[in-house]
C-alpha cells in the first residue's frame, strides 16, 4: 500500500506492475525460499520506488539511505540504536529526514520504546538478496555496518551509567551478529574484531565482567575467521 501510494498508482495499476515485474531481475533468493515470490517482488518494488524518489527529489538523502539500509540489514534484527545511525553523516538533521522518509514509506520502523530503528525481517532479507547480491556490494555494506558500530565512542559518553548502557548496546549487537547467519560477512573484517576487543576493554573497566563472558562465542568466531595468530584476534 505504501509503495502504491508513494508511486501514485491506482490499485489496478499497481497490481499490473507487480504481475509484470521480472522476478529474475530482482530476487536472487540467497537465504531460502520461505516467502511467496510475489511478496519478494512487492518488497523489492518498495525499495525501488523509495530510492528512485530520493534520487530524483533528495539526492543527498539517497546517498545516506544506502548506508542506513546496509547497516540495518546486517546488524541485529532487534534493531540498531537510532542515535548511532545519526552519526553516519556529519549533518544529523539530514539523517533524521532520511529516517523519517524511510519510516513513512514503511521500509523501516521504530522499536516500541522509540530507542531503536528496525528493518522488518522480510524487508531485510529481500534487501540482502537484491541490493547485496554481489561481493562488491557486500563489502561496501559490511563497511557501512562496521562503521556504524565503530563510531560508538564510549569515552565521549557522559555519565557512568550511560557508558555502561552503551557498552551493553555494543555487546547486544556483537552477540546478535555472531548468531545471525546473514551477518557472517562482518566477522571476516578485522575492524569488526577490533571492535570486539574495544568492547571487552570497556566492559572490564566499567565493572561488567559478565558482559565479557557473553562475548566468548564472538571471540571464538573471530579467532576461527581471522586465525588465532591475527593481532586483532589476540587482542580479543
Question: How would you describe each model-predicted region?
Answer:
Residues 1-187, 191-198, 203, 207-210, ...:
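Aliphatic-rich helical/repeat scaffold segments used for oligomerization and domain docking
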Amino acid at each position: 500500500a505504501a509503495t502504491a501510494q508513494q508511486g501514485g498508482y491506482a490499485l489496478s495499476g499497481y497490481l499490473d506492475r507487480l504481475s509484470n515485474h521480472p522476478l529474475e531481475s530482482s530476487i536472487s533468493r540467497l537465504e531460502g525460499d520461505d516467502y511467496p515470490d510475489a511478496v519478494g517482488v512487492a518488497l523489492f518494488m518498495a525499495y525501488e520506488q523509495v530510492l528512485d524518489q530520493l534520487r530524483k527529489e533528495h539526492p543527498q538523502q539517497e546517498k545516506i539511505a544506502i548506508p542506513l539500509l546496509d547497516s540495518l540489514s546486517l546488524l541485529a534484527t532487534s534493531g540498531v540504536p537510532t542515535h548511532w545511525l545519526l552519526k553516519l553523516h556529519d549533518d544529523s538533521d539530514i539523517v533524521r529526514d532520511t529516517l523519517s522518509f524511510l519510516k513513512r514509506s514503511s521500509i523501516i520502523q521504530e522499536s516500541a520504546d522509540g530507542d531503536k530503528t528496525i528493518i522488518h525481517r522480510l524487508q531485510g532479507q529481500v534487501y540482502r538478496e537484491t541490493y547485496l547480491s554481489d561481493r562488491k556490494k557486500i563489502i561496501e555494506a559490511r563497511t557501512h555496518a562496521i562503521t556504524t558500530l565503530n563510531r560508538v565512542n564510549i569515552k565521549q559518553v557522559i555519565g557512568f551509567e550511560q557508558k555502561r548502557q552503551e557498552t551493553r548496546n555494543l555487546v547486544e549487537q556483537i552477540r546478535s551478529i555472531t548468531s545471525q547467519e546473514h551477518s557472517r560477512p562482518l566477522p571476516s573484517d578485522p575492524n569488526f574484531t577490533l571492535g570486539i576487543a574495544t568492547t571487552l576493554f570497556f566492559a572490564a573497566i566499567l565493572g561488567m565482567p559478565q558482559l565479557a563472558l557473553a562475548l566468548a562465542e564472538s571471540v571464538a568466531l573471530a579467532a576461527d575467521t581471522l586465525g588465532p595468530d591475527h593481532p586483532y584476534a589476540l587482542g580479543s
